[in-house]
Structures are given as C-alpha cells and as structure tokens.
Amino acid sequence: MMALAGSCFAADFTDKSADPNAMPEVPAEFEVQLFAGEPLVRQPCSMAFDAKGRLFVGMGPQYRSPKPETPGDSVVMVLDTDGDGQADSTKVFAIGFNAIQGLAWHGRDLWIANAPDLTLVRDLDGDDQADQYVRVYTDLGNLEHGLHGLNWAPDGKLYMSKGNSKGLN
C-alpha cells in the first residue's frame, strides 16, 4: 500500500491533537509506509499511475479559493530516484489548471477533471512534460459538485462522477 500525505484544501484546523505521522492500521501481512508527503507533494487532490507504473499527482493550490495570483493547479510525476521506496523529487508534467479533481491515463493521454473542463494532455516528444493540451468538454460546473473521479473501464468508456452543478443535465 502506498500513502501520500497532504490535504486537498488549505484549512486552518485548531485541533492539532492527531499525529500527522500516524499510519493506518492494517492486517499483519500488509505494510504501510509513507511514499511522499509535504513539502514534496503539496495539496494533492488526485493521483494516477501511467503504463510504466509512474505516479502522477494532481496538486491543488487553487482548490476552494481560486485567485489570479495563486499558482495554477499542476500535475507532477513523483519520483524515487534512489530506489529506497520513498519519493525524493518531482517533475512537473502539466501546468495551468483551475481545480484538478481527477486523473486517469488512457494510452499516452492523461485525462484531467479540471472544473469546469475535461482536459486531456499528451507528451508528444518523450521528455515527460505535456506538450499538447486539449479541452475535450467544458461547462461541467464548479469544483464543488463538478466533474470528479475519472476512470477508464474495460468497455473502453470513460466514467466519471458529476454532482448537481450545471452542465450535462
């Protein structure tokens, strides 16, 4: 089991009694260890593995309070370059999103739920950075009840959750 530590929203909780380093309890035949945490991964809101088994994380500084001066949401590759089982670096894969709420790989395409858009990005030249950004659909509502949870199914269709905000009604 892999664990990512972080929060999808920037809240100032006054109750600090919970141990931020505590891991979930699991049966004896399992082990849980932290793979990546802050500051390496900040405000993670979604994650997906590509066909090579690499972890991609959508980070959301825009979540809940988007402002023009706040950096846009991004997708980063989270890397374990020394093979010790813990992430030690990231590489920016795609930038400039408003509110990443879901990631799903399909072939070379990374599909991104990015309120109010559904976007796909591609790395065309193999440098591990997205070169092509395609807005597949827009007007999918706000980030609260908008597009979330992307999953490609065995039937070849992309499934997603969408709440009661405007678009696709």
Which residues make up each language-model segment?
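Bacterial N-terminal signal peptides
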Residues: 1-7
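Beta-propeller domains with acidic blade repeats across secreted/periplasmic ectodomains
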Residues: 9-169
